[in-house]
Design a protein with these regions (language model features):
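Non-catalytic beta-strand/loop surface segments
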Residues: 1, 19-57, 92-96, 100, ...
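Active-site recognition of the HExxH zinc-binding catalytic motif
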Residues: 3-15, 245
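Extracytoplasmic/secreted envelope proteins and their assembly/folding machinery
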Residues: 6, 23, 27, 60-63, ...
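Helix N-cap motif at beta-to-alpha junctions
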Residues: 54-58, 169-174
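Structured segments of extracytoplasmic/periplasmic soluble domains
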Residues: 11-16, 65-73, 105, 109, ...
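M16/insulysin-pitrilysin zinc metalloprotease superfamily fold
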Residues: 16, 51-98
Length: 245
């Protein structure tokens, strides 16, 4: 759906965990580690938590903080409201408004006509798949997300059986794997998680869609129309087919 649960969860797991119950461990790592890369990103079909460091001790510490955040986050209801959405009243005579880190972020994203166009194109080409929805969250739908749905999403999908863990660089892979197993993976049983993505079926005829985007009331409407044509290609593993386009 368009409620942005994966995006809100990406923010929320980095707001304290079992071993690191501080408010924002992500910011603490940015300030106090030797990291060369530290981030988290939500895509329509996955969420990534990459870390990098050229210092071995620091790298293991980064791994520990991130693994604990992913598999054992606190994700309290207060965190959900902070990172997702909540009601806010600035003054008694003002209207109640919606606020939230992800809610505000996506309002900014949806203020760009290019972003709106790009998203509607993907959603129109793949309506029956996860790519047909706004993984970051549509501000008009984010406020429908409940704390229970938020928690259930983590319980269902944030499991080692539904993950891919990659190491890259000149390091001792066996040492990394032993750390993973001894500190985290040994505590989980292998389970079956249904997260496969089915291919979008071809359309019987071309689809046409008119969408709208906002402009300020003082802004001219001249030369503000966009036209885009999109094609659904074969799987990306069919290199010749994709290269032809």
């Amino acid at each position: 759906n368009d409620r942005g649960v994966a995006h809100i969860l990406e923010h929320s797991v980095l707001c304290g965990s079992r071993k690191y119950p501080v408010k924002e461990p992500f910011l603490e790592l940015l300030k106090g580690s030797l990291q060369t890369f530290l981030n988290a990103m939500t895509f329509p079909d996955k969420t990534m938590y990459p870390v990098a460091s050229r210092n071995k001790k620091d790298f293991f510490n980064l791994m520990d903080v991130y693994l604990d955040a992913v598999f054992y986050p606190n994700i309290t209801e207060e965190t959900f409201m902070q990172e997702g959405w909540h009601h806010e009243l600035e003054l008694p005579d003002k209207n109640i408004t919606y606020k939230g880190v992800v809610f505000n972020e996506m309002k900014g994203v949806f203020s760009s006509p290019e972003n709106i166009l790009d998203r509607h194109l993907a959603h129109s080409l793949f309506p029956s798949t996860t790519y047909g929805f706004e993984s970051g969250g549509d501000p008009e739908a984010i406020t429908d997300l409940t704390y229970r749905e938020f928690k259930n999403f983590h319980n269902k999908y944030y499991h080692p059986s539904n993950s891919r863990i990659f190491f890259y660089g000149d390091g001792d892979t066996l040492e990394y794997l032993n750390f993973l197993d001894n500190e985290y993976l040994k505590d989980f049983e292998s389970i079956q998680i249904e997260s496969a993505i089915n291919a979008q079926r071809r359309f019987s005829k071309p689809k046409r869609k008119i969408i709208f985007y906002p402009v300020s009331k003082d802004e001219s409407l001249d030369k503000k129309t966009f036209v885009v044509v999109g094609f659904k290609l074969d799987k990306s593993t069919n290199h010749e087919h994709c290269l032809a386009f």
